């Protein structure tokens, strides 16, 4: 349920006056979002577009008034005794308890998204010196965010932290920032397309253990599926429950739609449940998504009592999550450098990495090298000498999926919303939330700010922000029939931001699993991190963090080999006395 942006972006451009929907004067700043930009400058540059409406010559600012909106966060669930949390904690302790190196490795890491930050954090915990290079001037990669001239933040995606994310939950605890997660009630809330303005809930009772709490939530909901449909759905899932992980992995070759047909699951289950799940998990529809992705999510949600419980971060991710990691890394002697874009991976005669060459002419040398960028960036920079190696050749199957994140500030407080994530079940929108209610930093008692994931976005990522906002407003008119009209005759837009990501998380289509690489590459001293690499949480924030831990583990395990390589390299550079 993570939207994202690539870990390299330039926001440049000019401003121009125009009008929104032919009505109001506006101001727009923009950036290129063409795929050609990816090819020419080794990064995906995606559009960040904003609209600011002027009122009597003064820019819109928040004004507090009498209206009071009550937000209720829930206590942090007891996750510490779950098997997955304990396993994740054990992996974290591997780094803290490992033998401190006599000579720390200098490890150069490209990309300061969650994967790169995680790699750096755990290498520093093990006593090594990470040098983390980020191409842009902002941390976070797919969880990056920016502050506009009004002081409002806009993000690359609507990021949800689940109870079933054990490595992320451990990370928050290790950094001492558990209080930055705002836990919501244990429910999943779906809009009802045939009943505009109405919602259907799956409420998970606290008194029941897993999987009974999830089964109870499904059985109690009679608005989305009939009893015969529930029975057929359950029978279809039975092999997954009995067959376990082996069965789940075997379904990688089927799309969700193909699996449903094979298992005799009614089409309405797809319409009522799987479309929303597919778009939330990977921004694509069930006719493209691998069934393995759905089964992994269902397994996590149903096997852990608090697995599907959701939390929002209490503010913008770069400051509230990424900076604590950076501070931790620096406190242990590591470095984090922004505006450090890699232009080329230079090789030694034996095919190993000599150094990373940056666009500013700098050469960064280390004892080991990690690429923690999105897979599309890596594929552009793989040296020609490596391209025929099977490990790298398989990466061609892995392609980032486009997604768009939309933020709209309205002139009033919308009433038909919740302090929670909402599944729109719209053909154009995936999930959304009123961030003025769900997030402390964005709280506003007088005006709503809706953050929405626009997906699937392949046909829309090249369109103008005006078209995207107009289409979004048409969908919102169905979700808020009494409060929003497509022509703005009801709630008025004060401003908006549109963030386009032509290449986000890797597209989890059938038969991708064999192409996902291990973190340790066949090139000595070169490693990968990223949610596309081999780990059990697929394309997610949890997957990114776990991949970083696994990458760091590989480096630590290779310490002796890497030390010998570095010593040999130094000796070869020493001139021989004549």
Curated annotation (Swiss-Prot):
<dbReference type="GO" id="GO:0009509">
    <property type="term" value="C:chromoplast"/>
</dbReference>
<feature type="binding site">
    <location>
        <position position="300"/>
    </location>
    <ligand>
        <name>substrate</name>
    </ligand>
</feature>
<dbReference type="GO" id="GO:0042170">
    <property type="term" value="C:plastid membrane"/>
</dbReference>
<dbReference type="GO" id="GO:0071949">
    <property type="term" value="F:FAD binding"/>
</dbReference>
<protein>
    <recommendedName>
        <fullName>15-cis-phytoene desaturase, chloroplastic/chromoplastic</fullName>
        <ecNumber>1.3.5.5</ecNumber>
    </recommendedName>
</protein>
<feature type="binding site">
    <location>
        <position position="115"/>
    </location>
    <ligand>
        <name>FAD</name>
    </ligand>
</feature>
<dbReference type="InterPro" id="IPR014102">
    <property type="entry name" value="Phytoene_desaturase"/>
</dbReference>
<dbReference type="InterPro" id="IPR050464">
    <property type="entry name" value="Zeta_carotene_desat/Oxidored"/>
</dbReference>
<dbReference type="InterPro" id="IPR036188">
    <property type="entry name" value="FAD/NAD-bd_sf"/>
</dbReference>
<dbReference type="GO" id="GO:0009507">
    <property type="term" value="C:chloroplast"/>
</dbReference>
<keyword id="KW-0274">FAD</keyword>
<comment type="similarity">
    <text>Belongs to the carotenoid/retinoid oxidoreductase family.</text>
</comment>
<feature type="binding site">
    <location>
        <position position="342"/>
    </location>
    <ligand>
        <name>FAD</name>
    </ligand>
</feature>
<feature type="binding site">
    <location>
        <position position="539"/>
    </location>
    <ligand>
        <name>substrate</name>
    </ligand>
</feature>
<keyword id="KW-0150">Chloroplast</keyword>
<feature type="binding site">
    <location>
        <position position="531"/>
    </location>
    <ligand>
        <name>FAD</name>
    </ligand>
</feature>
<keyword id="KW-0934">Plastid</keyword>
<dbReference type="GO" id="GO:0016120">
    <property type="term" value="P:carotene biosynthetic process"/>
</dbReference>
<dbReference type="GO" id="GO:0016117">
    <property type="term" value="P:carotenoid biosynthetic process"/>
</dbReference>
<feature type="transit peptide" description="Chloroplast and chromoplast">
    <location>
        <begin position="1"/>
        <end position="87"/>
    </location>
</feature>
<feature type="binding site">
    <location>
        <position position="541"/>
    </location>
    <ligand>
        <name>FAD</name>
    </ligand>
</feature>
<dbReference type="GO" id="GO:0009534">
    <property type="term" value="C:chloroplast thylakoid"/>
</dbReference>
<keyword id="KW-0560">Oxidoreductase</keyword>
<comment type="subunit">
    <text>Homotetramer. Homotetramer is the active form of the enzyme.</text>
</comment>
<keyword id="KW-0809">Transit peptide</keyword>
<dbReference type="Pfam" id="PF01593">
    <property type="entry name" value="Amino_oxidase"/>
</dbReference>
<feature type="binding site">
    <location>
        <position position="142"/>
    </location>
    <ligand>
        <name>FAD</name>
    </ligand>
</feature>
<keyword id="KW-0285">Flavoprotein</keyword>
<feature type="binding site">
    <location>
        <begin position="134"/>
        <end position="135"/>
    </location>
    <ligand>
        <name>FAD</name>
    </ligand>
</feature>
<feature type="binding site">
    <location>
        <begin position="159"/>
        <end position="160"/>
    </location>
    <ligand>
        <name>FAD</name>
    </ligand>
</feature>
<comment type="function">
    <text>Active with decylplastoquinone (DPQ) as substrate. Also active with other benzoquinones, which are strongly preferred over naphthoquinones as substrates.</text>
</comment>
<dbReference type="GO" id="GO:0051289">
    <property type="term" value="P:protein homotetramerization"/>
</dbReference>
<keyword id="KW-0472">Membrane</keyword>
<comment type="pathway">
    <text>Carotenoid biosynthesis; lycopene biosynthesis.</text>
</comment>
<dbReference type="InterPro" id="IPR002937">
    <property type="entry name" value="Amino_oxidase"/>
</dbReference>
<dbReference type="GO" id="GO:0016166">
    <property type="term" value="F:phytoene dehydrogenase activity"/>
</dbReference>
<feature type="binding site">
    <location>
        <position position="165"/>
    </location>
    <ligand>
        <name>FAD</name>
    </ligand>
</feature>
<keyword id="KW-0125">Carotenoid biosynthesis</keyword>
<keyword id="KW-0957">Chromoplast</keyword>
């Amino acid at each position: 349920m993570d939207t994202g942006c690539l870990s390299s972006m330039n926001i440049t451009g000019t401003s121009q006056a125009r009008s929104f929907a032919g009505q109001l004067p506006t101001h727009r700043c923009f950036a290129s979002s063409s795929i050609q930009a990816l090819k020419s400058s080794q990064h995906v540059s995606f559009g960040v577009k904003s609209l600011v409406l002027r009122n009597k010559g003064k820019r819109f600012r928040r004004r507090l008034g009498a209206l009071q909106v009550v937000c209720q966060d829930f206590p942090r669930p007891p996750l510490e005794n779950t098997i997955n949390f304990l396993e994740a904690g054990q992996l974290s302790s591997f780094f803290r308890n490992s033998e401190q190196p006599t000579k720390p490795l200098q490890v150069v890491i490209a990309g300061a998204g969650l994967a790169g930050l995680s790699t750096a954090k755990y290498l520093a915990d093990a006593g090594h010196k990470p040098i983390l290079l980020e191409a842009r001037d902002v941390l976070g990669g797919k969880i990056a965010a920016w502050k506009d001239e009004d002081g409002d933040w806009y993000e690359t995606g609507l990021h949800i932290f689940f109870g079933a994310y054990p490595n992320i939950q451990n990370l928050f605890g290790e950094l001492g920032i558990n209080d930055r997660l705002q836990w919501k009630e244990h429910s999943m809330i779906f809009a009802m397309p045939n009943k505009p303005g109405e919602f259907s809930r799956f409420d998970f009772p606290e008194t029941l253990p897993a999987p009974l709490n999830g089964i109870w939530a499904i059985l109690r909901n009679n608005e989305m599926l009939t009893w015969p449909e529930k029975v057929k759905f359950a029978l279809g899932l039975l092999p997954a429950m009995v067959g376990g992980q082996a069965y789940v992995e075997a379904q990688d070759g089927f799309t969700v739609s193909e699996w449903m047909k094979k298992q005799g699951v009614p089409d309405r289950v797809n319409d009522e449940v799987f479309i929303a799940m597919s778009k939330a998990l990977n921004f694509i529809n069930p006719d493209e998504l691998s069934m393995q992705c759905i089964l992994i999510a269902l397994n996590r949600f149903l096997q852990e009592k608090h697995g599907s419980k959701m939390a929002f971060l209490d503010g913008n991710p770069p400051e509230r999550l990424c900076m604590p990691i950076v501070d931790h890394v620096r406190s242990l002697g590591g470095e984090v450098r922004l505006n450090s874009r890699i232009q080329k991976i230079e090789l030694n005669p034996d095919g190993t990495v000599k150094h990373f060459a940056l666009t500013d002419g700098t050469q960064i040398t280390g004892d080991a090298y990690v690429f923690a960028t999105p897979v599309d960036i890596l594929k552009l920079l793989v040296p020609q000498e490596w391209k025929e190696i099977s490990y790298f050749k398989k990466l061609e199957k892995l392609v980032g999926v486009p997604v768009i994140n939309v933020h709209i500030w309205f002139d009033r407080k919308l009433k038909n919303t919740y302090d929670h994530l909402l599944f729109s079940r719209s053909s154009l929108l995936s999930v959304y939330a009123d961030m003025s209610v769900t997030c402390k930093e964005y709280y506003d008692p007088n005006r709503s700010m809706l953050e929405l994931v626009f997906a699937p976005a392949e046909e829309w990522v090249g369109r103008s922000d005006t078209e995207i906002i107009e289409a979004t407003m048409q969908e919102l008119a169905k979700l808020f029939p009494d409060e929003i009209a497509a022509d703005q005759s009801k709630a008025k837009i004060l401003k908006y931001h549109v963030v386009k990501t032509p290449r986000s998380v890797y597209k989890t289509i059938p038969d991708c699993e064999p192409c996902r690489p291990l973190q340790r590459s066949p090139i000595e001293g070169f490693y990968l991190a990223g949610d596309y690499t081999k780990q059990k949480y697929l394309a997610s924030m949890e997957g990114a963090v776990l991949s970083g831990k696994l990458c760091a583990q590989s480096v630590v395990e290779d310490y002796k080999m890497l030390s010998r390589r570095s010593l040999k390299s130094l000796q070869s550079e020493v001139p021989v006395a004549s």
